Design a protein with these regions (language model features):
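Active-site C-terminal subdomain of aminotransferase-like
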Residues: 102-188
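PLP-dependent aminotransferase-like
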Residues: 1-44
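Conserved active-site segment immediately N-terminal to the catalytic lysine
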Residues: 91-102
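Conserved PLP cofactor-binding pocket of PLP-dependent enzymes
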Residues: 223-240
Length: 267
């Protein structure tokens, strides 16, 4: 997907020799293929996107990939920007997991949140800025080495209270309920899901559209709701709808009804 490509590009710009292991559109790479590449190439690190928003795919085989990585003395680094905490992931199984404030954590954009295994922290050259080691050193003094996004941190604190008061399991369940409703309704009016059912994300739906996607986006915006067009290889033939965070099921029912009318009027 788009963000897996960006992750590879990011590694390459930092001097890494990147080998891509590709899977089918709407799915994830085969575990046996991953195992063969790891055992043959002996990489220093494995990078993966947990929740690929361009295709609506959640990689639910990452625990097995982590086991393969650690068995072969490789680090495993995960991009979960649009996944945590609505798409479950056990961060303790990985060396680095990065997310952000503005997706399923329901806060405004502006803060990066990173889990890391401190045992591996010193194994890579340190960059001139955003040095994790400096953050760790400052934590003991309840300080940060650089000016933090204070308003975002306050907003994040509020959103975390909401999630924790609700309970993480219930929060995940609500997202699954919203996503199941959305797919069931839209498939019934002619849309086709992009992700394979087992890998269907809890936070973003990606669907092939029965009519021109831009018509749908424009007409839906007139009702007061905004959705996104496709990305990557399916940019011109799909739509994406985010359900993460504070998106109510009642909103999705309105969107589904509006989409039904748009499809009927534009066949």
């Amino acid at each position: 997907g788009e963000f897996s490509e960006r992750l590879a590009e990011s590694a390459e710009t930092r001097g890494a020799h990147v080998m891509k292991i590709e899977g089918p559109l709407g799915g994830v790479p085969d575990l046996n293929n991953i195992r063969e590449v790891i055992e043959e190439e002996k990489p220093k690190a494995i990078l993966a996107v947990h929740n690929e928003t361009s295709t609506g795919v959640a990689n639910r085989l990452l625990n097995e990939v982590a086991d393969l990585a650690h068995k072969n003395n490789a680090m495993i680094l995960i991009d979960s920007v649009s996944g945590m905490p609505a798409e479950p992931i056990d961060a303790s199984r990985f060396d680095v997991v990065a997310t952000a404030s503005h997706k399923a954590l329901m806060a405004p954009p502006g803060a990066a949140i990173v889990f890391f295994n401190d045992a591996k922290m010193g194994s890579a050259p340190r960059p001139p800025a955003i040095d994790v080691a400096k953050f760790v050193k400052s934590m003991g003094k309840l300080e940060t080495p650089y000016t933090p996004p204070i308003p975002i941190m306050y907003a994040l604190n509020v959103s975390l209270d909401i999630i924790l008061d609700m309970g993480l399991e219930k929060y995940v369940g609500i997202h699954m309920e919203k996503m199941n409703y959305l797919y069931n309704e839209l498939i019934g009016i002619g849309f086709r899901e992009v992700p394979q059912p087992f890998f269907r994300s809890n936070t973003v739906a990606a669907l092939y559209s029965p009519i021109e996607p831009q018509i749908i986006i424009k007409k839906l915006r007139e009702t007061g709701y905004t959705i996104s067009g496709g990305m990557w290889k399916i940019r011109d033939k799909s739509i994406r709808i985010g359900v993460m965070g504070d998106v109510a099921l009642s909103d999705l029912k309105i969107v589904a009804d509006a989409l039904r009318k748009i499809i009927q009027q534009n066949k």
